[in-house]
Amino acid sequence: MATQGQVITCKAAVAYEPNKPLVIEDVQVAPPQAGEVRIKILYTALCHTDAYTWSGKDPEGLFPCILGHEAAGIVESVGEGVTEVQAGDHVIPCYQAECRECKFCKSGKTNLCGKVRSATGVGIMMNDRKSRFSVNGKPIYHFMGTSTFSQYTVVHDVSVAKIDPTAPLDKVCLLGCGVPTGLGAVWNTAKVEPGSNVAIFGLGTVGLAVAEGAKTAGASRIIGIDIDSKKYETAKKFGVNEFVNPKDHDKPIQEVIVDLTDGGVDYSFECIGNVSVMRAALECCHKGWGTSVIVGVAASGQEISTRPFQLVTGRVWKGTAFGGFKSRTQVPWLVEKYMNKEIKVDEYITHNLTLGEINKAFDLLHEGTCLRCVLDTSK
């Protein structure tokens, strides 16, 4: 492309301070160095993780930064040594890297990758420990190794999944975070079996993806738990077949679920990020075999607790990141499943706005009616 090797000036939404409106700026995006890829972002969605960092509660939150980690675009150029993608490829940037070489990747036990974490966790690139973004000569931090609230971004090549060029980018951008996180929590982390009873705490995008995953896994009872009863109607479309509002009961929700399920559920999923709910999710599991998966991200410094007897008597407490999916290997597979109509994606998109309307999009995110808002970055 004509821009290869040059600094690109483009529009991006910059977070200068926690909880202050994002500012649409002309940002300079440097060319990719060795092992890096510059991507033209076409569509990006908002996730509660973006809002979490923007709130100032994230211990790794750095300002000023360009947020965003759920997106899709086209490779503009690549740095030296990059062989798996080239200019023109359709891609999804992945906050969960996959180098296939580090001890994590080689272990066969996890989808975590250690290659670039020391850089992405502090908002910079590995090569020179610097940012590729600047405004008027002042550096702007990266976010989660993706920074997709920008018309162009630079990412490590181990964080890029090449996808089917016929897939609609305004839809499959969701496969960069929330939907795989929920599906994978069921398929990879919990390994839910047919006939299982499942409880899902929190019916946002991730919770609904858990429901979809549980339904396709053959779960029989899929119990949705949320303090907003209006969410049940939508949740039914994703597989939830029972609903409980904790506000309707005068005893702890774990006791309600245990009574409802003859001793507890086989699997529970906490999709909120609330440590007291995490405890309830564990304690509503059946003695002897119940497994609870923590999916939601709690605020910095918060701790989980329960009585050890809960674990001694056979319950298992697990966590998951990106649903246990290997990003570069399995995101393309998820795109194919979507193209074959084997998983939902469109149904999670409730709003479509432009990059210039990003602050409105964050307002919508905090309203119960918004699941995913997709932004067209060209406007």
UniProtKB/Swiss-Prot annotation:
An alcohol binds at residues 49, 69. GO terms for molecular function: alcohol dehydrogenase (NAD+) activity; S-(hydroxymethyl)glutathione dehydrogenase (NAD+) activity; S-(hydroxymethyl)glutathione dehydrogenase (NADP+) activity; S-nitrosoglutathione reductase (NADH) activity; zinc ion binding. Optimum pH is 7.9-9. Its EC number is 1.1.1.1, 1.1.1.-, 1.1.1.284. The keyword Cytoplasm applies. Repressed by thiol-modifying agents N-ethylmaleimide (NEM) and 5,5-dithio-bis-(2-nitrobenzoic acid) (DTNB), as well as by methyl methanethiosulfonate (MMTS) in a dose-dependent manner. Inhibited by hydrogen peroxide H(2)O(2). Induction: Down-regulated by wounding and activated by salicylic acid (SA). This is Alcohol dehydrogenase class-3. It comes from Arabidopsis thaliana. The gene is ADH2.
